Amino acid sequence: IKVLCPPGTEHKEIYDYENVHSVKDYISYDGGESFRKSFEYPSSMDSKRLDIRYKEDGGIDKDGVIEIRRGVKDLSLGDAHYAQVRIMVDGKKYIKGMAVYSDDLPDGVDVIFNTNKSKSTPKMEVLKDIKNDPDNPFGSLIKERGGQSYYDDPKGKYTDPITGKKQSLSLVNKRAEEGDWGEWSKTLPSQFLSKQSLSLIKKQLGLATADKQAEFDEIKSLTNPTVKKTLLKSFADDCDSAAVHLQAAALPRQKYQVILPLTSLKDTEVYAPNYKDGETVALIRYPHGGTFEIPILKVNNKNAEGKRVLGNTPADAVGITKKVADRLSGADFDGDTVMVIPCNSTNSKVKITSTHSLKGLADFDTKDAYGPDSSKPVKVDAKGREYYSRNGKTYQRMNNTQTEMGKISNLITDMTLKGATEPELARAVRHSMVVIDAEKHKLDYKQSEIDNGIKSLKTKYQGSYDSNGHYHEGAATLISRAKSETQVLKRKGSPKINPDGSLSYKEVREEYTDKDGKVRVRTQKSTKMAETRDARTLSSGTPQEEAYAKYANSMKSLANQARREMVSTGKIAYSASAKTAYQSEVKSLDAKLNLALRNAPRERQAQTLANATVAAKKKENPDMTKAEVKKASQQALTQARNQVGASRTSIDITDREWEAIQAGAISENKLTQILNNTNIDTVRQRATPRATTQISKSKQNRIAALNASGYSTSEIADALGISSSTVVKYLNGKE
């Protein structure tokens, strides 16, 4: 433990642990050499330095982009070419969007904000009002490390803890920056894949199944039974989850990228330096409506504007035109991301289906069609709910985006699988575009529901009668039903593993009286897929659903196999003599475990503090939306963890300590605790037998399947943890 103390403190005093506490509200960027406050209330920019580029002047082509004068100290993006930022203006307003450098700003202007609003909107009304929350004035989390920065300023009120120079807080507050978006995606959501060709669906679901089978075979080969049981339990849980979420294997080089506008590109091009110049790629945005929202673009990495704005090697961004963004269900340039998939090139084995844009979506703008007459609410009720006016009609601002988006996404999926016409799909997609923007842009989504005839579409594509003759509407295909909520009797305790590997729960029938005086039976939430033994019971019978049902059932079967294997796996007998022989290793593991376990009460304390903070904020604002509560919870938990010093300490197991474990010097209970606090992948490598150079049949099948899907030799080798030469041998039939 490193103890900070004032000059003159005697050495013995640092062992007075009752008076040693975690550093509160401060964070270190250099391993404890110096500390800064974890969050400073943002500095504010004078609005005289800000100009607005309105719709009429081309702002609509870059809506959401913040252009910053290069070389201005208090507006530096650091090492990043682009970042999603918040900048406070005049102490009461703020702008948010994607910030990039610009070299052609007017004299006296350091920031230009691009908007789709017309010139009739006053400058300050284009900006957003800050929240009445000193911990979160933007209503959005700032990056914990690197979100705020300082610059040298002789008149500054802060002091650099290393150099002693006076500093000021930068105006830029980063929510995310270059490098934060580009994680490789390991899955393909059913929302996209279920609307593609049946051959692609089967291929990617088959790959996902092969991946899981190979993982199961590897776990079964592990030599340490306690490690084996730990991994089997985790594997079974993962398979159960996979059956519900229906995620297929990713396509080669599939990657998420943030989008930025480039006005000099053609509408058939994309600036994407992470991909090969000249190849074609598909862009998919979520939530995904259908193949009519997928642009297939040619990579043009020679574009001069792209090089100037994004650089030659952007970590995770692509440049597109506004027309392409509009096709992506009206994507904005304020931090929206797309999934990029190389495909449809001459030599590509990946073929993505893309169809022409729906005529009913042409020139449709959600804000023009359903936006309020004024950005100011006409009233705010006692619970803080905002009401707006449109064409003389007053409506409440949406506060349940996720729920409404789930409903319309399920409807679009069901309509697609059941063969809806293009005009019908256009109605549903228009409404989905309104729903996704409704909360952010204060749109009248209920009027959109009426105008687009959503009720009649639900009746036609989701209406059904049960065995008792009762009419129901809701998710109507396996794809939409899998994650649909269902209520089950309240369950108590841990589930029991049945002889076939399935789980059974102890159900408790509890009755209670609701606020209306009615007697109810207490239930808990589950999903329809989790509660059925056969996924086909959720299918309406389409070929796409059959492919997904086969996959889901294979995941359920693997989960059951894993649990049967777990029950039949023994344990290493505890050996007192081994404990004596490896005495120092046992002591070392005990010390490491004790250190790791010390975090548990701190984490509980952090959770308690965070819950109290969020409860207080909810009391001040009873009508907080789910999204606002989630943001507040994340921020409160981060601050509470810093406050109490809660941080997970991973146990690093040495070679000698592993020998002690294998010899039985550690009891099974203690080893289980150690495994719960270490890097399980490293342990898996230690426990995997090295006696054979042959790879399993399931891995051989994966090599063939990945090759058929277009993965390169090196990509297959990385995915399977083997050498490229081994991959080549098996592909050439030499093994």
PLM region spans:
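Beta-strand-enriched accessory nucleic-acid recognition/scaffold domains that flank the catalytic cores
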Residues: 2-310, 317-330, 342-735
